[in-house]
């Protein structure tokens, strides 16, 4: 039998139309979504702000990787909840000052439903 080697690098494509200074309509694969600013920042509030979208991507990656690692460890995870609280330095996005790290602190909390014991959950957390 021939082993199939998966690609380690793949090309990702995304298109975005920007009908205003705050709204970005994104299309990736066959999925569309809108990134926008809230009304108080001259947006139309049709979607999460760009910085909120970055945190949403972190939540999505946390979910995907945690479930893959759980599967690798043989753990049954029936539900996962990710909660993120971040301290965001707005000076960069307001062009007040150039900053290196916009998120001064990110607290990421994961709650899950599983039949695994605490030792197995701890192993999942460290992986």
Segments from the language model and where they lie:
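Extended beta-strand/beta-hairpin segments
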Residues: 1-56, 68-127
